[in-house]
């Protein structure tokens, strides 16, 4: 089934990123680490977005892993160097916090902009995916993500809703809760 294939693909992609260590300045490249999604590599057929619709393809569902990793990278206050959103909303992360990935297509990359190594820890248990980024806490700062979601209307027919727009902000606070910075992370339409 598509659900079983998706679960296998999420487990397999999580296993491939688990344990990756990035030294200062190194860039994590999701497609390079996970590799080409093929049946020979163990990936299964499951639902994926392509060409404006849901299709069945080998590796479908791995964007849940890339999206969970993206959220972990944001909360670790790492530098996102490449990310494209899905053409439709996804149900596993908040609006505007989903990077779509595809072999030979959209990419997701982030840079370890810290002065120390970081490690990706990914696991699946009972069909739940958890991803953490381990590193050294040097100042006690923390990140909160916020987003502003609005309806997009047709320019030709102003009363017709044609989509949704999400603007995502990264808010960095010091250990005492004082806002240090608020950065527009991305706009998803």
Predicted regions and their residues:
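Well-ordered beta-sheet/strand-loop patches within structured domains
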Residues: 1-189
């Amino acid at each position: 089934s598509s659900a079983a294939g998706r679960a296998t693909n999420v487990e397999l992609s999580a296993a491939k990123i688990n344990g990756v260590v990035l030294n200062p300045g190194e860039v994590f490249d999701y497609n390079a680490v996970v590799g080409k999604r093929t049946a020979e590599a163990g990936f299964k057929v499951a639902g994926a977005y392509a060409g404006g619709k849901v299709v069945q393809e080998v590796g479908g569902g791995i964007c849940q892993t890339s999206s969970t990793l993206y959220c972990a990278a944001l909360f670790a206050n790492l530098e996102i160097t490449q990310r494209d959103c899905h053409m439709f909303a996804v149900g596993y992360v908040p609006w505007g916090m989903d990077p779509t990935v595809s072999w030979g297509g959209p990419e997701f990359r982030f840079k370890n902009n810290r002065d120390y190594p970081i490690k990706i820890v990914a696991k699946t248990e009972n069909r739940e995916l958890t991803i953490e980024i381990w590193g050294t806490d040097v100042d006690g700062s923390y990140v909160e993500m916020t987003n502003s979601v609005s309806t997009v209307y047709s320019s030709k027919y102003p009363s017709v809703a044609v989509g949704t727009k999400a603007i995502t902000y990264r808010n960095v606070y010091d250990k005492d809760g004082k806002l240090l910075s608020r950065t527009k992370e991305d706009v998803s339409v």
